[in-house]
Amino acid sequence: MNLVGSYAHHHHHHHHHHPHPAHPMLHEPFLFGPASRCHQERPYFQSWLLSPADAAPDFPAGGPPPAAAAAAASYGPDARPGQSPGRLEALGGRLGRRKGSGPKKERRRTESINSAFAELRECIPNVPADTKLSKIKTLRLATSYIAYLMDVLAKDAQAGDPEAFKAELKKADGGRESKRKRELQQHEGFPPALGPGEKRIKGRTGWPQQVWALELNQ
């Protein structure tokens, strides 16, 4: 139904019963009232009141111009001017391959780390077979075991032959025992006993002669 025709007919019928001084603005078929400002907006009212059948065929109601629709279809929703559809498809393919290669690389890295930790657990001795070690526990045990081995190597380098090492420990114990006896005798007022091969040296008493000798040499 044409809004323009129905409104124009109703407008003339209304003024037939109520005579009114003729005014050129009142007989305009596309005006809603006598306001003069509406005359400037006449083209906009015409475009709003026309029915879809009366509209221009080049611009269908509710859709963009054909040229704009063709441009949007050729570029696509995410396309930018200057890019062809083929270039966009190639770019999308590269991105898809890059995303697919990421999980594979991460999986290989995880497998490599797990296998390295499994080998490290086998090198740690005295671990029960049913014990499940986490990665941090494995690293801590490996660090402790390395420190233990370094300590063993250092002791072997200092001691040399184990039999000679035991003999040196006995000599050291005997020396400490004789020194303790001499200090006890000095404390009780008796002259210190001489050990085998020692000679009494004249000098100050009350302290071991070795201590005095060290003080004099300084």
From Swiss-Prot:
**Which terms are listed as keywords in the entry?**
Activator, Developmental protein, DNA-binding, Nucleus, Phosphoprotein, Transcription, Transcription regulation
Source organism per UniProt: Bos taurus
Q: Which gene encodes it?
A: HAND1
What modifications does the entry list under PTM / processing?
A: Phosphorylation by PLK4 disrupts the interaction with MDFIC and leads to translocation into the nucleoplasm, allowing dimerization and transcription factor activity.
Keyword Ribonucleoprotein assigned: no
> How would you summarize the oligomeric state and partners of this protein?
Efficient DNA binding requires dimerization with another bHLH protein. Forms homodimers and heterodimers with TCF3 gene products E12 and E47, HAND2 and HEY1, HEY2 and HEYL (hairy-related transcription factors). Interacts with MDFIC. Interacts with SOX15; the interaction enhances HAND1-induced differentiation of trophoblast giant cells.
Which InterPro entries does this one have? bHLH_dom, E-box_TF_Regulators, HLH_DNA-bd_sf
Give the modified residues of type Phosphothreonine: T110
- The bHLH domain covers 97-149
What SUPFAM superfamilies does the record tag this protein with? HLH, helix-loop-helix DNA-binding domain
Question: Region (Disordered) spans which residues?
Answer: 1-23, 56-112, 172-203
User: Which residues fall in a coiled-coil region?
Assistant: none
Listed PANTHER family: BASIC HELIX-LOOP-HELIX TRANSCRIPTION FACTOR, TWIST, HEART- AND NEURAL CREST DERIVATIVES-EXPRESSED PROTEIN 1
Q: Where is the composition biased (Basic residues)?
A: 8-21, 95-107
Predominant location category: nucleus
Q: Which GO terms describe its biological process?
A: angiogenesis; cardiac left ventricle formation; cardiac right ventricle formation; cardiac septum morphogenesis; cartilage morphogenesis; embryonic heart tube formation; heart development; heart looping
Q: At what positions is Phosphoserine found?
A: S112
* One Pfam family hit: HLH
The biased composition feature labelled Low complexity covers 68-92
Provide the protein name.
Heart- and neural crest derivatives-expressed protein 1
Q: Where in the cell is it found?
A: Nucleus, Nucleoplasm; Nucleus, Nucleolus
Functional note: Transcription factor that plays an essential role in both trophoblast giant cell differentiation and in cardiac morphogenesis. Binds the DNA sequence 5'-NRTCTG-3' (non-canonical E-box). Acts as a transcriptional repressor of SOX15. In the adult, could be required for ongoing expression of cardiac-specific genes.
GO molecular function ontology, one term from the record: protein homodimerization activity
Q: Which domain of life is it from?
A: Eukaryota
Tell me if Transmembrane helix is a UniProt keyword of this record.
Answer: no
List the record's Gene Ontology CC terms alphabetically.
cytoplasm; nucleolus; nucleoplasm; RNA polymerase II transcription regulator complex
